[in-house]
Amino acid sequence: MASPVLLLKEGTSRTTGRDALRNNILAAKTLAEMLRSSLGPKGLDKMLIDSFGDVTITNDGATIVKDMEIQHPAAKLLVEAAKAQDAEVGDGTTSAVVLAGALLEKAESLLDQNIHPTIIIEGYKKAYTKALELLPQLGTRIDIRDLNSSVARDTLRKIAFTTLASKFIAEGAELNKIIDMVIDAIVNVAEPLPNGGYNVSLDLIKIDKKKGGSIEDSVLVKGLVLDKEVVHPGMPRRVTKAKIAVLDAALEVEKPEISAKISITSPEQIKAFLDEESKYLKDMVDKLASIGANVVICQKGIDDIAQHFLAKKGILAVRRVKRSDIEKLEKALGARIISSIKDATPDDLGYAELVEERRVGNDKMVFIEGAKNLKAVNILLRGSNDMALDEAERSINDALHALRNILLEPVILPGGGAIELELAMKLREYARSVGGKEQLAIEAFADALEEIPMILAETAGLEAISALMDLRARHAKGLTNTGVDVIGGKIVDDVYALNIIEPIRVKAQVLKSATEAATAILKIDDLIAAAPLKSEKKGGEGSKEESGGEGGAGTPSLGD
């Protein structure tokens, strides 16, 4: 009798065929189900508590999946899809995960009918390609050549409103203030493109948060704000026509790299040592003054003696500024970062109309306005607590990305589930022209798209199935812009009239991320999970059998 062949390491678990596939589908569906209730303007928040006890309250899909400690490898694929969505377009993460979950749920029904995963994958790919082809035909091209025109600003307001309304950070006057700030920031940094759109570098838009006041107290600064104060009481608090030295070298006496001791045998030697130290620091300050600097912004420390000499020269100085801020200052001020003070030249200096220390709440901050590169802007957010500020920052980031998307490709689509309904209808027509079992997969893709309007109807307080039937009937009559007005809690014939619109780039990326994640999971038919390391076995809760290896072959485990 032949001896058994040991192919895998002891303790390795393996699940094959349909069992592996269904296990992965279940894990992905579970994650999608968790995010389902966070979709749309009336989406509910999730409270996330990390291992240190820090609490995050948000309905932002990207933040939820990043902060959840997902273990199951298939669910991680959906997390990667959400991250790709966030990195590419900065919005639509919840939609991408929910749609991927719906695609896998519909695929499971087809698997029950003994349709091979390869056929489902091919059908999904054809449906995705057709949907991408249909999007521009169903969209409306907008004229944004003059960003300061009332028509262009009105369109940008609608886009920003759709994004911010789902975050619920503010209402009424506060929401209008935030929308105006976001639009002004985007318009300020936009660069025209040959296709009639604009390129927007979001690196030029800095967001700072300061606790205190309300959202309405937030301001847009055409320049930069540093969350630091002037280092010495004898320094000026306001400098106009500032020539700014940006340093990543310390204004301190450097310690030698090797261990060294100084042997002092008399009081005169102590005095000589201290005098030499003062002279060294004075020479550094004199050098900065000689090249014309009247403001010094330093990434590292500034010695007390150096502060004294800077104050005597009437130079405003700020120390221990973050590296990211130093790099932004370099771009905004037209400066060159100075690493060696003795080699500094006047050409290394940046320029700003005004550098001023101002009190914000209980703290002081340094405002740099009228920078050489007028494209740099800073949004300073105010709010009552850290959680509100964090959510406001996430919301504004989403709105900035949404506006960037519309400026890159100025085509808008009807929101409120209208575009998904219309795509589903067109895909069913297309499916009839495709022969074989792939037709069923294309129809399943169309059914999955209808999950989005159904969820929106649910969050609006409507009965989901009835709402879907109503939407289908109206779309069949040619009312292509019929969708769900979630805030009003009703179905409307023209979502454009209520400013419920979405950029085409976001929707195209949602389809791409969801389809890629779903097809990647459908391709897997073998799940081999290595045994956990001994340290994990000791420290982990439960046995390998309970967790299914590395979140793998047993019951789907999304987190700890």
Curated annotation (Swiss-Prot):
Ranges of biased composition (kind: Basic and acidic residues): 535-547
Enzyme class: hydrolase
Catalytic activity: ATP + H2O = ADP + phosphate + H(+)
Alphabetical list of InterPro entries matching this protein: Chaperone_TCP-1, Chaperonin_TCP-1_CS, Cpn60/GroEL/TCP-1, GroEL-like_apical_dom_sf, GROEL-like_equatorial_sf, TCP-1-like_intermed_sf, TCP-1_chaperonin, thermosome_alpha
Key words, A-Z: ATP-binding, Chaperone, Cytoplasm, Hydrolase, Nucleotide-binding, Stress response
Region span, Disordered: 535-560
One matching Pfam family: Cpn60_TCP1
GO CC entries: cytoplasm
Induction info: Transcription is induced by heat shock (shift from 75 to 86 degrees Celsius). At 80 degrees Celsius and above ThsA and ThsB are the major proteins synthesized (at protein level).
GO-annotated molecular function: ATP binding; ATP hydrolysis activity; ATP-dependent protein folding chaperone; unfolded protein binding
Record's subcellular location: Cytoplasm
EC code(s) of this entry: 3.6.4.-
Function: Molecular chaperone; binds unfolded polypeptides in vitro, stimulates protein folding and has ATPase activity. One of the most abundant proteins in the cell at all temperatures.
UniProt family annotation: Belongs to the TCP-1 chaperonin family.
Subunit (UniProt): Forms a heterooligomeric complex of two stacked nine-membered rings; one of alpha and the other of beta subunits. Sometimes called a 'rosettasome'.
NCBIfam families for the chain: thermosome_alpha, thermosome_arch, thermosome_beta
Name listed for the protein in its UniProt record: Thermosome subunit alpha
Lineage of producing organism: Archaea, Thermoproteota, Thermoprotei, Sulfolobales, Sulfolobaceae
